């Protein structure tokens, strides 16, 4: 939108100045005036006078004043006549800048208030001043007053009257036809500082906005106050600098100021002037010396509180929750910082672990002395026990081929150390038979003598010890004790049965009163410390992984139940082996624990022994979750020998009691309910039914005799134990064909093809990465 404003006549009141100058484009304009004239100040009230005839002449180089008017105080009045246009080439440069500011101001106001330029054009109808207006104004006799003050007062009175009497339609009709002789007056729309003749539409716009956004009474009061302040401003305005368009000099002052000084003084002037924060829009539209920033900051800024709800209170409201959120934010930041620090520490620790692993592997590979090799191997073993995550780095460093070559050296100590570290890394030798052979023993306390009878019969048929018959032995509670005695310590069955009976008599002998007190105190009827002492003496404090030093030792595991990880119990496996890097078992476990700790944790039956705390975990009897560990043993074997088929799995029970009595009661007691829950949790037949249906024929063998009496777990009387043995022998006699079939399977040797395949695999593992002929 382009607006052309043509100002025909400007009358300047100048005081005590000799000359002033300006610039029009590149040419300098000099205005020659009398010695006495009024000085221009944009703070004071400046009025616009219209005359009927032109009294000043304009040319490119000079402007000469041809008419002087003197007031009662004998001050000279210099009347300067300048025809200016925002698009005309003859306008002063500074005034043109101000006209462009007015234009940009109108654009901003139109966008902020009316919303479109079309509405702006329809509402703001501009009228170009003409000679008719000049004659109308001159007829009023505004310039006939004897002094300036009276002229200003008459201007105020006239403007107030014209604002009340005239309307937009009357003003429009007056400009349309002057010769009709109507008494309609032309609008003189004044502002408080500098007058700009934009017509009745601006007055209507200002009045409408002020009435909508402000209190009318408050605006009228502010208008009267400012009008009263205008009078002393005219009398006392002698030391204030002129407007940016005019430079003045006092008679007793120095040389005239140049244009640069004028600009610097004009820029410093607004800082010292008090400007109201809320002014009418007509004031901003009529002030060419103020820019768009003043409009937005002063007037539009005053409208924002009307459009929004108290913006000053919003920061306060935001600060209050922010203050309350400060502790939460600090806690979150502290937690985040701790998490980052822990993560960084883990990364640093992981890097240091990997570097340490590489250093140990490289040191071992550089060693040639067998004794020094043993030391290096043990150092690497201890390192991997403490940091199992380093096994992957060791495998990448080709530690397995080097260890397999070391195992060929005729040194028993070195071979034992190499077997231990190979088992820790997860490397395993081929199975003993044609496939994987698994032995799983249920829990049941002293009723484990029933399982001993089955094993005795199996040894008689195969003529081999148990640890040579099976590749993997797993047990729960009393089954873990049997697995350790048979698989790790290679005890004969007679010695094992004698030790088993002695353990029962030593542990399960307790006074009823003392046991009841202990039960209420530690939830354990028997003394757990006595049981731990017996285990340390009989089993020892060797680590589980150290049993892998024996070349005839099978893979052995004991199962316990962790009760403090989550809401549901979880099975935990104490192993004498490790899984190969990249192989993940579904069950928790480790091989860095002592053997007596494994048995203690696996046999911590609730009510009999106290739960066992190992590290951060709380262990109880494994029978609470998996009283039949056959499925767990099968899963572990698939992790150890993933490419080897299953030859057989033998599951040994400790006897089950089935009552034929049927109760006719319609309800059960709380004790009965709890007993049913425990029985269902420790049930072993469901796993048997599942495996029997899933596994191939002649692969799964379950031996669990039915006993005629419900014998408790802590039965230590010899007659009761003899009764259990007798019932077990009768059961084996009834299943003699089944036992013979199992013995035949366990007695089979590997085929020649399997032996060749195992030899090729061993050679390929020993010389991995080396030329083909070196493998032969």
From Swiss-Prot:
Task: Report the locations given in the UniProt record.
Answer: Endoplasmic reticulum membrane; Microsome membrane; Mitochondrion membrane; Peroxisome membrane
- State where composition is biased (Basic and acidic residues): 226-238, 307-331
- What main location does UniProt list? endoplasmic reticulum
Q: Which keywords does this Swiss-Prot/TrEMBL entry list? A: Endoplasmic reticulum, Hydrolase, Lipid degradation, Lipid metabolism, Membrane, Microsome, Mitochondrion, Peroxisome, Transmembrane, Transmembrane helix
Enumerate the residue ranges of region (Disordered). 226-274, 306-331
Q: Name one GO molecular function term.
A: calcium-independent phospholipase A2 activity
Is Endoplasmic reticulum tagged as a keyword? yes
UniProt-annotated catalytic positions: 477 (nucleophile), 621 (proton acceptor)
Give residue numbers for sequence motif DGA/G.
621-623
Q: How is its activity regulated?
A: Calcium-independent phospholipase.
- Protein name from the UniProt record: Calcium-independent phospholipase A2-gamma
Q: Where do we find the motif GXGXXG here?
A: 443-448
Q: Where are the transmembrane segments?
A: 469-489
Decide whether keyword Zinc is in the record: no
Protein source organism: Rattus norvegicus (Rat)
Q: Which SUPFAM superfamilies match?
A: FabD/lysophospholipase-like
Motif, GXSXG: chain positions: 475-479
List the cysteine pairs that form cystine.
none
Pfam families registered for this protein in UniProt? Patatin
PROSITE patterns according to UniProt: PNPLA
- Which InterPro entries does its entry note? Acyl_Trfase/lysoPLipase, PNPLA8-like, PNPLA_dom
Q: Which GO terms describe its cellular component?
A: endoplasmic reticulum membrane; membrane; mitochondrial membrane; mitochondrion; peroxisomal membrane; peroxisome
Functional summary from the UniProt entry: Calcium-independent and membrane-bound phospholipase, that catalyzes the esterolytic cleavage of fatty acids from glycerophospholipids to yield free fatty acids and lysophospholipids, hence regulating membrane physical properties and the release of lipid second messengers and growth factors. Hydrolyzes phosphatidylethanolamine, phosphatidylcholine and probably phosphatidylinositol with a possible preference for the former.
| Modified sites of kind N6-succinyllysine | 730
Reactions accelerated catalytically: a 1,2-diacyl-sn-glycero-3-phosphocholine + H2O = a 1-acyl-sn-glycero-3-phosphocholine + a fatty acid + H(+); a 1,2-diacyl-sn-glycero-3-phosphocholine + H2O = a 2-acyl-sn-glycero-3-phosphocholine + a fatty acid + H(+); a 1,2-diacyl-sn-glycero-3-phosphoethanolamine + H2O = a 1-acyl-sn-glycero-3-phosphoethanolamine + a fatty acid + H(+); a 1-O-(1Z-alkenyl)-2-acyl-sn-glycero-3-phosphocholine + H2O = a 1-O-(1Z-alkenyl)-sn-glycero-3-phosphocholine + a fatty acid + H(+)
């Amino acid at each position: 939108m382009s607006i052309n404003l043509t100002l025909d006549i400007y009358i300047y009141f100048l005081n005590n100045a000799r000359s002033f100058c300006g610039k029009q484009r590149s040419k300098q304009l000099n205005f020659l005036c009398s010695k006495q004239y009024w000085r221009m100040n944009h703070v004071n009230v400046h009025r616009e006078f219209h005359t009927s005839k032109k009294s000043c002449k304009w040319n490119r180089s000079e402007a000469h004043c041809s008419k002087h008017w003197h007031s009662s105080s004998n001050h000279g009045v210099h009347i300067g006549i300048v025809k200016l246009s925002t698009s005309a080439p003859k306008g002063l440069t500074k005034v043109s800048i101000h006209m462009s500011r007015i234009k940009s101001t109108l654009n901003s106001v139109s966008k902020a208030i009316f919303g479109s330029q079309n509405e702006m054009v329809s509402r703001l109808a501009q009228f170009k001043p003409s000679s008719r207006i000049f004659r109308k104004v001159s007829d009023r006799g505004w310039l006939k007053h004897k002094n300036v003050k009276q002229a200003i007062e008459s201007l105020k009175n006239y403007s107030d009257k014209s604002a009340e009497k005239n309307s937009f339609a009357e003003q429009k009709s007056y400009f349309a036809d002057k010769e009709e002789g109507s008494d309609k007056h032309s609008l003189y729309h004044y502002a408080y500082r500098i007058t700009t003749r934009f017509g009745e539409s601006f007055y209507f716009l200002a009045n409408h906005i002020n009435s909508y956004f402000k209190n009318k009474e408050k605006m009228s009061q502010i208008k009267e106050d400012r009008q009263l302040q205008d009078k002393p401003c005219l009398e006392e305005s002698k030391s204030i600098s002129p407007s940016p368009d005019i430079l003045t000099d006092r008679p007793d002052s120095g040389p005239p100021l140049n244009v640069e000084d004028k600009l610097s003084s004009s820029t410093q002037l607004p800082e010292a002037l008090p400007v109201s924060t809320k002014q009418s829009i007509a004031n901003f539209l009529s002030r060419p010396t103020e820019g768009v920033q003043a409009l937005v900051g002063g007037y539009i800024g005053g409208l924002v509180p009307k459009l929004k709800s108290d913006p000053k209170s919003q920061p306060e409201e935001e600060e209050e929750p922010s203050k309350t959120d400060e502790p939460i934010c600090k806690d979150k930041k502290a937690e985040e910082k701790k998490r980052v620090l822990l993560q960084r520490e883990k990364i640093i620790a992981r890097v240091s672990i990997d570097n340490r692993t590489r250093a140990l592997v490289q040191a071992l590979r550089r060693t040639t002395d067998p004794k020094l090799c043993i030391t290096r191997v043990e150092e690497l073993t201890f390192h991997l026990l403490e940091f199992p995550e380093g096994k992957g780095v060791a495998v990448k460093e080709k530690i397995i081929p080097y260890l397999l070559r070391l195992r060929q050296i005729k040194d028993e100590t070195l071979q034992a150390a190499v077997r231990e570290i190979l088992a820790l890394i997860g490397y395993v030798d081929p199975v003993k038979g044609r496939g994987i052979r698994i032995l799983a023993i249920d829990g049941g306390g002293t009723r484990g003598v029933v399982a001993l009878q089955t094993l005795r019969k199996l040894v008689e048929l195969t003529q081999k010890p148990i640890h040579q018959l099976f590749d993997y032995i797993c047990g729960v509670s009393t089954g873990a004790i049997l697995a350790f005695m048979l698989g790790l310590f290679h005890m004969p069955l007679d010695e094992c049965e004698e030790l088993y009976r002695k353990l029962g008599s030593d542990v399960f002998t307790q006074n009823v009163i003392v046991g009841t007190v202990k039960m209420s105190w530690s939830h354990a009827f028997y003394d757990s410390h006595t049981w731990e002492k017996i285990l340390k003496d009989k089993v020892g404090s060797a680590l589980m992984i150290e049993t892998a030093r024996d070349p005839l030792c099978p893979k052995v595991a004991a199962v316990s139940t962790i009760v403090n990880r989550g809401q549901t119990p979880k099975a935990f496996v104490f192993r004498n082996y490790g899984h190969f890097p990249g192989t993940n078992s579904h069950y928790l476990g480790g091989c860095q624990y002592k053997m007596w700790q494994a048995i203690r944790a696996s046999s911590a039956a609730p009510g009999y022994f106290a739960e066992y705390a190992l590290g951060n975990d709380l262990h109880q009897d494994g029978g609470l979750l998996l009283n039949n560990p056959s499925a767990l043993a099968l899963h572990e074997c698939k992790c150890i020998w993933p490419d080897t088929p299953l030859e057989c799995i033998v599951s040994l029970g400790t006897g089950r009691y089935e009552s034929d009595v049927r109760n006719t009661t319609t309800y059960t007691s709380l004790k009965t309910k709890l007993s049913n829950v425990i029985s269902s949790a420790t049930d072993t037949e469901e796993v048997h039914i599942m495996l029997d249906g899933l596994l191939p024929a002649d692969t799964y063998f379950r031996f669990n005799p039915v006993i005629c009496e419900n014998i408790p777990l802590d039965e230590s009387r010899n007659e009761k134990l003899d009764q259990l043995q007798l019932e077990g022998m009768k059961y084996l006699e009834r299943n003699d064909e089944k036992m013979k079939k199992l013995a035949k399977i366990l007695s089979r040797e590997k085929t020649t093809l399997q032996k060749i395949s195992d030899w090729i695999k061993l050679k390929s593992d020993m010389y991995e990465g080396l030329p083909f002929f070196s493998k032969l």
